[in-house]
Amino acid sequence: MAKTIAYDEEARRGLERGLNALADAVKVTLGPKGRNVVLEKKWGAPTITNDGVSIAKEIELEDPYEKIGAELVKEVAKKTDDVAGDGTTTATVLAQALVREGLRNVAAGANPLGLKRGIEKAVEKVTETLLKSAKEVETKDQIAATAAISAGDQSIGDLIAEAMDKVGNEGVITVEESNTFGLQLELTEGMRFDKGYISGYFVTDAERQEAVLEDPFILLVSSKVSTVKDLLPLLEKVIQAGKPLLIIAEDVEGEALSTLVVNKIRGTFKSVAVKAPGFGDRRKAMLQDMAILTGGQVISEEVGLSLESADISLLGKARKVVVTKDETTIVEGAGDSDAIAGRVAQIRTEIENSDSDYDREKLQERLAKLAGGVAVIKAGAATEVELKERKHRIEDAVRNAKAAVEEGIVAGGGVALLHAIPALDELKLEGEEATGANIVRVALEAPLKQIAFNGGLEPGVVAEKVRNSPAGTGLNAATGEYEDLLKAGIADPVKVTRSALQNAASIAGLFLTTEAVVADKPEKAAAPAGDPTGGMGGMDF
């Protein structure tokens, strides 16, 4: 395919137009008075959301250079969402401000590499300042406040805090759709481990990139599964039972994997293959934990069991299994409660008798997985559109609360970034690096200014007032008052704020140092078929 090439200022401005198109759509959602964005779907009802990454993913631009610019800033939102679970809109606003200021300096003749180095040093300093000023999350109320800000709903924040209180900070919290109105919290036996599906073809929900199995059988194998003849007798029995199958093995490869994938694509049989977590003896122990939790047995030659002679009675069961690309959650395994309690007691004894800190840590992880359970938040709403939007908000808020527990919290509302600006004076940079640091200085005000603008206030006036206020004091955009934001319960996890800034700076550096852009040449649309005599094509007279 033919390519089109743009150089120098033309290339950078093309990328910036794409970035601005995406950022302008995303930034209207920032803050408590931010608006929603409606996303058209090819099938089904439209989605209404105020989540930055969901909006960013939907934007496809026609101009090839603008398209690349939008894709680059999409990456900022995606990366921030992956790392911290929130802050995608803040990251987009920061990226736009950094690129706008940076390109102005490049156009005036500044060296892009010097600017990039200055930006990197300034971001490192601000990150260090944010981490130093972070307050540890100690109370249930602090968790509730942080989650409530992310979800824009205090009742959601309270429920998430209660869920974390029940299952612990490392516990698993899942969100499900409910047929009733309102929110409910249920505690179930369950486990989550850090291994996802082996092949993307197993996905059942393309939008969320998840494989969801309801009431599945669970096959646990301690070795590799590669030949289909070993698996076939058992597969036939499972198909007859009419249930999906989750396979957890050392690995699933070759014809065994292709058989499962082909049957899934054809709709003949729903299954998911996942690698077992851990290595060596720890893998065996974790497989045994899963067997006890699900009421199954591990198929292993060590205990005289082989895959080709395995019966359906050796399979475990669960109410539901959710598999993403990175992790697997088993909800409500069908294991005997006495057997689970016995296994928990055994692991506790091993922890007491262990001399190694590493072994003790890994045993604690196993104990948390087995004993912690899974908190299920069931969300209901009047319409399907509202339900999807609400479910998404709750999932974001759960990740936000976990990030807060992990690294602590700072004042929200863009105030922590603005109050970190004086730390840049300590850098003592010169020349273009100092200009790079000044670009960051200007950009750090952007989130607060956007929150003020969305709240119908004058951004410059608000920024000036907050700049001259004591640390942690800022605008509560919901009420229009200036107050101590942490006391008012307006806090952001420092992990979210830090990730947003680091990812925005990373992309801004790439924008500034770009000197040429190579893109696919847009194809001209073919003329519609017509009658060579001049009549209308496709008509019978």
Curated annotation (Swiss-Prot):
Changing residue 45 to S: In strain: Linda. The keyword Transit peptide does not apply. InterPro entries: Chaperonin_Cpn60_CS, Cpn60/GroEL, Cpn60/GroEL/TCP-1, GroEL-like_apical_dom_sf, GROEL-like_equatorial_sf, TCP-1-like_intermed_sf. Gene3D superfamilies: GroEL, GroEL-like equatorial domain, TCP-1-like chaperonin intermediate domain. Keywords: ATP-binding, Cell wall, Chaperone, Isomerase, Nucleotide-binding, Secreted. GO terms for cellular component: capsule; cell surface; cytoplasm; extracellular region. It comes from the Bacteria. Pfam families: Cpn60_TCP1. It is found in: Secreted, Capsule; Cell surface; Secreted, Cell wall. Belongs to the chaperonin (HSP60) family. This is Chaperonin GroEL 2. The lineage of its organism: Bacteria, Bacillati, Actinomycetota, Actinomycetes, Mycobacteriales.
